[in-house]
Amino acid sequence: MYIKLDIQTEFEVKSLSDLPNFKKLMGNLKMKINKSQLARELNVDRRTIDKYLNGFTPKGTKNKTSKIDTYYEVIAALLSSDSKQIFYYKRVLWQYLTDNHGLKCSQSAFRAYINRKPEFRTYFDEGKRILSGHSVGVRYETPPGEQAQLDWKESIRFETKSGEIVYVNVAVLLLSYSRFKVFHLNISKSQSVLMSFMTEAFEMFGGVPKVIVTDNMKTVMDEARTEHFTGTINNKFAQFAQDFGFKVQPCIAGRPNTKGKVEAPMKLLDEIHTYQGRFTFEELHEFVQKLCARINQTFHQGTGKIPVFALKQEKNLLQPLPKSAIRDSYMIKHKLVKVNTSGMISYKSNQYSVPAEYQGKTVGLQVYDNQIYVYHNMKLIVQHKISQSKLNYKEEHYKKALAKSLPKYPNIDNLAKQNLSVIGEVYRNEE
């Protein structure tokens, strides 16, 4: 398993509204802003540049925070499915908050606030309570190096460009302070895959956070945490946590509110569906890594930081990595093999195809969970299911190799399918 991070640091100022974010970026980089150059390029006065850099927003577009926002958590709890209390009217809720929580605002201001929040408005319009498992919950921040959040985007049905249906999973590990995250696409969610992924993610972070917040996934918890039971951590994962020096903090089953920071990237992973039928598995793997890099280089609205730059600040406060011998013991083993002249690699006396351009090159081989993963220079180039057949071709590999040897043949697609069918029958009879 390899994770490659491609970091770009260019930022284009197209208008005055870009200046606040530009100031944050330059602040992260500890670089001085050339206000005179900005004034010339945007064709405005230097004083205007100063004004926008200091947070000026044109009249009518300024986003004002409401003092009622401080009561968001209380309101969400009162209107949730866990609450036994019932509020038939907004006025009744306003009165309750005024009497019991010190709310100081007019009824009209309170009604307007509720109407601006769809999750609250539907309670009164349609009688729908806020589901506990999906409520926003308390917004809180953790100090640098303190916490990371772990989750899976599970069982994503994906159709490859060849028409094959695969169910893929994406693991996400996110540092809570910087919001820097690492994605990993895999068919498997096994414990060996999880621990190998986390090891490589820690290496990418440059250290280990003190706490890992997770749900009650079976690879971590033998028994789920509930409101009345602390849960039981799996022995092997407990040893992994001890070796790396972090504490496991499972969420209460069915109420993963404390894992809210990692939930937002899960929605971004829905971009995968826009490429249904367009990617091979290997191309999908590459897309997920590019998506992760893009998110890490984008301003985070909640923190006002760019995760990749905020990581530089957080890295110094992470715990040190354990010795390489410990880290290596959790990594999925990697073996170097050479691609033969037929564009195949060997595994246990059977051969598996790779793209034609890797013929004669040395590639990396990883085998786990009944799958073979082949890498070249940290890039996943092909994935095969382990088979008992002597020859195992991906149709697109065979087709390209055939087209190279028979460049003028009129219908390579049909010939490739016929040949592969014959090859399959020949070796099936020899088994």
UniProtKB/Swiss-Prot annotation:
Classification via SUPFAM superfamilies = Ribonuclease H-like
PROSITE patterns in alphabetical order: HTH_IS21 (PS50531), INTEGRASE (PS50994)
Task: Say yes or no: keyword Metal-binding present.
Answer: no
Q: Does the keyword Repeat apply?
A: no
Q: Which UniProt keywords apply?
A: DNA recombination, DNA-binding, Transposable element, Transposition
* GO BP term (any one): transposition
Gene3D superfamilies of this UniProt entry? Answer: Ribonuclease H-like superfamily/Ribonuclease H (3.30.420.10)
Molecular function GO labels: DNA binding
Q: Where is the signal peptide?
A: none
Looking at the record, the residues that make up the HTH IS21-type domain are 20-79
Look up the domain of life of the source.
Bacteria
DNA-binding region(s), residue ranges: 35-54
Domain (Integrase catalytic): give its ranges: 140-315
A Pfam family (short name) is rve
Q: What does this protein do?
A: Involved in the transposition of the insertion sequence.
Similarity remark: Belongs to the transposase IS21/IS408/IS1162 family.
- Record-given protein name: Transposase for insertion sequence element IS232
Which lineage? Answer: Bacteria, Bacillati, Bacillota, Bacilli, Bacillales
